[in-house]
Amino acid sequence: KIILLLILVASHAQAHTATWYGGQFHGKLTASGERYNQNAFTCASNKYKFGTRLKVINKANGKSVICRVNDRGGFGKYGTTLDLSKGAFKKIAPLSDGKVRVMIRRV
């Protein structure tokens, strides 16, 4: 029973890398058709469906943010799982960090 529980927990919270995007995309249409707001708590993901709410936890400091998937991107080729809005990223790390290791959970 314990092994099964560990497998289930591991499948719902895996280590990933997140970056952020902002300024040049602010006000432009996202892949979902809504306008990008760099201050909203949203993110781009090629794995999760539009509208999925994710809890993103910075592994280095434990800070977290809940964001909603509303965009896609070409960031996967750089080893990045999520591209957070500027507002969401600022909740978990200074923008100057640029890229952070995170845990991701659906909520």
Question: What is the role of each PLM region?
Answer:
Residues I2-S11:
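Sec-dependent N-terminal signal peptides
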Residues A13-V107:
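Secreted/periplasmic proteins
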